[in-house]
Amino acid sequence: MKFLLSCLCFFTFLSFTFAQTGALPTVRTKLGHLTLYVNNERGNFNGINDLPASFSHSFGTDQEATPLSIVSEQDSISVTLRHGTPAVFRIVRQAKGDTVLCRFSSHKEAKAARFPDAYKKANQGKTLILIPEVYELINVVFALTTYGKTDAIYKNTPYFQAVMAHFSPFAGHAAVRTIDSLLTQSEDHYAPLKMDSYAYLFTGDRITKEGTYDRTSWGEVNTLEPYIPLLEDFARKSKYRNFYRDHQSYYNGLILDFQQNIDVATMKRWLEQQFPRTRYSAVKVLFTPLVGWNQSANQFEDNGFSEAHAHVNFPFVGKNADRQPASLVKGQRMMIIFTELNHSYLNPEADRYAKEIAVAYRDLSGWITTGKPSAGYSNPLSCFEEYMNYGLVTLLYSDLFDAATFATLKTGLEKSMVENRGFQRFREFDEELLKLYQNRKPGQTVADLYPAIIAWAARR
């Protein structure tokens, strides 16, 4: 799973020259990414080794002066972002043997979401499961692209066959060609385009901003906005809105299954009990039957109201489910949404211990495996968070299921994490975290166990 946080940057690359006076702040890295803290809000700075020798970027900020920290696996630097005035620093790319010259400034930010009092009143305390109309539209377009031929699109349903039968004649439409070209350039475009579609709704044949959200992905602009006219034309010519209406009962059935059998509200209550410093006024789970595996999350706050979004694939029941106990099937199906929702709770807590985690996980060679999915978690903080992510699954299972079901679920989870995903020490980590949880003092929460599990990791 590739997980990106809310201050992910969309960079504009520019050449520039300037007079260099004194030593510039410098951060060194052997990896392809860094961690950014903009006013203490963390985000991933990916693609370091693909950057040109010089580039600029402007962050959207509320304040004229904002602290920025840039952290690698080796060291860190801090600069001040100012509206219209660049802060200059260097990144030494040890893997490439060169240096990137960087100029970062800031500008007044447009809020990603606005929650007026009426919205707060209507949504306070709610957990909503949604298949939005424009959201499904962009996923239909994804299914028609070259990227759609991969496992990123779930194909084992009659619904997928209906999508292809209806929309394949429009595979040559400019909207499909344009989105296909973006995904060919980089699959990293996929999640922001999908997520940002939730900011829109249909008004007749027009696709317009819903009003609550300017953007629902991690960047400072809505990545889908330039392509809205193409999507409007595609929807009109393909009669997409008729297709969506004709399948409303199917969507409603999936949503009902989610509500009755996945029980996101229970997950939210458990997470709030275990991470009492983190609270969300509402939770929205957005999905489509077309997503094969890609998951992502984001959070928003305005006017004293906070909202967590989880973008997930639907947990379809496997072919052999009827041969398994119902409790085992339920546990397996819960994992998809829980491992995305819990990032909104465990990550803010991990940020409080970033320095200790950097020391404990300074040598990742024994924690992740080259050539397996774990290799994508190649900085200490993201590695620890992914271990905790699935460790929390074990803790939740221990509270919800009987001993036999729990043992089966735990064994399967650990096998998958170690053998399939390549997290070498997950069994040890999982056992230690479970032991700490089961032996915690009265009133202690999972958040209180962070120092102990980090100290355990430091001794490995």
Q: Language-model features: where?
A:
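Bacterial Sec-dependent N-terminal signal peptides
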Residues: 1-23
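Pan-zinc metallopeptidase signature
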Residues: 22-36, 54, 59, 84-85, ...
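Auxiliary, metal-adjacent structural segments of Zn-dependent hydrolase domains
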Residues: 53-60, 66-68, 251-309
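Post-HEXXH active-site segment of zinc metalloproteases
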Residues: 348-374
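Active-site scaffold of zinc-dependent metalloenzymes
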Residues: 211-213, 298-331
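Active-site recognition of the HExxH zinc-binding catalytic motif
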Residues: 329-355
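N-terminal low-structure segments adjacent to metalloprotease catalytic domains
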Residues: 20-239
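Second-shell loop/turn segments in exported
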Residues: 214-217, 253-261, 323-325, 332, ...
